[in-house]
Design a protein with these regions (language model features):
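Conserved Nudix-box catalytic region and its N-terminal flanking loop in Nudix hydrolases
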Residues: 32-76
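Short, charged, solvent-exposed linker or helix-capping segments at domain edges/interfaces
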Residues: 121-126, 146-148
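N-terminal amphipathic/basic-hydrophobic helices that include classical n-h-c signal peptides
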Residues: 1-12
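Conserved N-terminal beta-strand and adjoining loop/helix that marks the start
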Residues: 14-34, 52-55
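Active-site-adjacent beta-strand/loop module that shapes the phosphate/pyrophosphate-binding cleft
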Residues: 84-121, 135
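Charged phosphate-binding loop/patch that engages nucleotide di/tri-phosphates or the phosphate backbone
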Residues: 143-171
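A short coil-to-beta-strand element that immediately follows conserved catalytic motifs
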Residues: 74-85
Length: 171
């Protein structure tokens, strides 16, 4: 007795949702260490500044705005950008909470920037604080600090921006 079962693919609802267009910033100090901060809403979870691109806004404008909004200063200059969008999916429970179910995750253009200010200019007590603590770390170590669902994106950032750590360019 044989039963023919048609082939089908199980698709999670989130697989059909779009990615939210965003930017991320790898902010390097003069010692070629990168800025990371611990999230207010996820204790123990560290990340670099990132955020959405507003309608009509250029990605590099969004990067400078996000820097100012999240760390209180935009005293930086762009030195590089990822060639392609880097994407990650949010876990379903976070996607519903963070994006009200409109997006499956984020697609990000990442900018490497050189911080031109003093550490004292960094202020996490912004209008809508996202971070509780910050530090400068070696680029390679950021993958150990980030939440697991962002790890692949951060590994790509390390690979694409590693030339900065290995050179004296833009010091």
């Amino acid at each position: 007795f044989l039963v023919s079962v048609p082939f089908f693919k199980i698709i999670r609802m989130s697989d059909e949702l779009p990615y939210r267009p965003c930017v991320g910033i790898a902010l390097f100090n003069q010692d070629n260490k990168v800025f990371v901060a611990e999230r207010v809403d996820l204790p123990g979870s560290w990340q670099m500044p990132q955020g959405g691109i507003d309608p009509g806004e250029l990605p590099e404008e969004a990067a400078m705005r996000e820097l100012k909004e999240e760390i209180g200063t935009d005293h930086a200059e762009i030195i590089d950008r990822t060639e392609d969008w880097l994407c990650y999916d949010l876990p379903a429970n976070l996607s519903r909470k963070v994006f009200k179910g409109k997006y499956r995750g984020q697609k990000q253009l990442w900018y490497a920037m050189r911080f031109k200010g003093e550490d004292s200019e960094i202020n996490l007590h912004t209008e809508k604080p996202e971070f509780v603590e910050w530090k400068w770390v070696k680029l390679k170590s950021i993958t150990e600090l980030v939440i697991p669902f962002k790890k692949a994106v951060y590994e790509s950032i390390v690979e694409q921006f590693f030339w900065i750590v290995d050179s004296d360019v833009n010091r």
